[in-house]
Amino acid sequence: VKTLAGLEEVLAGELQQAGALQIETGTRAVFCETDLEGVYRLNLCLSTALRILIPIVTFEAENETELYDCMKEIPWEKYVSSKGTIAVDAIAQGEIFRHSHYIALKTKDAVVDRFRSLFQERPNVEVQFPDLRINVHNQDRAFTVSLDSSGTSLHRRGYRVDGEEAPLNEVLAAGMIRLSQWNRDCPFVDPMCGSGTLLIEAGFYAHQMAPNKYRKEGFGFQRWPNY
C-alpha cells in the first residue's frame, strides 16, 4: 500500500483497524496481507493510502531481452481482455535499468505481443482510466510486477472542485489530522482553510465515513474480469 513519506505508521494503524494481516512498514509504503474482499474494503476506507498494489510476479532480469521474456510469460489474459485497455507505471532504481519509461515500454510490448500471439488482437493503451493499470518496480536485477487495484491515486476523493490553486493533498491532510491526535469530540478549526481540505477530511474522520465513497472515477478493480 503506497503512501506519503512520514505517514507509514499512520497507515499501518489504519490497516490494522481494517483487518489486514502481516503488516510491515517500508519507505512510503506499508505491506500487508488480505483477501480480494479486503482489497475492495481498503480502497474504500483508507484515508492515508495513495494506491493499493497487488503483487503477482517477481523475477530477476539482467538485460532488456530477459525483461521482455519474463513479462511475456505472465498470463495477462487472466487480468484484462484483448479488447480492453492497459497502462504501465514503472519505477527504476539501480545501475542496470536506469529509465523507468523504457521499462514501461518493454512491459507494454510484451503484453501486447502475448495477446497478438494468442488472440490475433491486442489491448490498447489508455493512460488515464485503463481497464488494467500495471505497476512495475525495479531494484537492480529484481522486478516486482503488481496490479494497481486503485486505478487512479486515492487522494482523488471526488469532492474537490477543479481549478483550486495549490490545493493541499487529501492524503496529506488526513495524515496531518491523525498525527495531531485531535479529539473528535472537540471542535475543529482551520483559520486558513483555502479549499477546505482539512475541514472535509476532519469531517470524514469525525463521523467515521469512508473517505473514498464519493470517487467519481471509481476504482481500478471495478474494471477487472473477476469483479
What are these regions (language model features)?
Residues 145-179:
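SAM-dependent Rossmann-like transferase core, predominantly class I methyltransferases
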Residues 27, 147-149, 192:
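Glycine-rich, histidine-containing beta strand-loop boundary motifs that form or position
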Residues 168-227:
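Conserved S-adenosyl-L-methionine
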Residues 38, 94, 142, 151, ...:
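Short loop/turn segments at secondary-structure transitions that flank enzyme active sites
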Residues 134-150:
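C-terminal edge-of-domain segments
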Residues 121-139, 194-196:
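Positively charged, low-complexity, intrinsically disordered RNA-binding extensions
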Residues 1-130:
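Non-catalytic nucleic-acid substrate-recognition regions in nucleic-acid-modifying enzymes
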Residues 87, 144-146, 190:
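A structural signal for short, well-ordered beta-strand segments and their strand-loop junctions
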